[in-house]
A protein has these predicted regions:
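Extracytoplasmic/periplasmic soluble domains downstream of a signal peptide or transmembrane helix
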Residues: 1-132
């Protein structure tokens, strides 16, 4: 199944909760990552909380589903393709050295399907947290 990058934050913590998963194989948990669109919700459940993250704007789209995105995150796109060595996508503020002031979820998987030539990255921002 999916696994958390060991140097990333835990779900709901300030910074970047980064998770890698396969697009093929048993269960293929991230097979449909490419279907996520701007403002789609991604729900993460822990033992004590249900955390909703929302996919950031893709390709410069307008995102009325956010109450403003902080300037430190204005460069972060909801979905893009990068190289396997681009570890900056898992930084506390993705692709930046800025200090985090929001909770971010980053999902990474191989791209294209059945290849490890590139990585598909999805970034989402926390919008709701509820106790179970």
């Amino acid at each position: 199944g999916p696994g958390r990058y060991v140097d990333s934050q835990m779900p709901g913590e300030m910074g970047n909760f980064a998770v890698a998963g396969h697009r093929v194989g048993k269960g293929a948990p991230f097979n449909d990552l490419g279907k996520l669109e701007t403002c789609d919700d991604i729900v993460v459940e822990t033992q004590t909380e249900r955390i909703t993250y929302r996919v950031l704007p893709i390709d410069g789209e307008q995102a009325d589903c956010f109450n403003g995105i902080p300037p430190e995150y204005s460069h972060v796109v909801g979905r893009h393709i990068t190289t396997p060595g681009d570890v900056s996508v898992t930084n506390p503020v993705p692709e930046s050295d800025a200090a985090p002031n929001r909770e971010i979820l980053t999902l990474t998987t191989c791209h294209p399907q059945f290849s490890n030539a590139e990585r598909m990255i999805v970034h989402a921002m926390e919008v709701e947290k509820e106790e179970k």
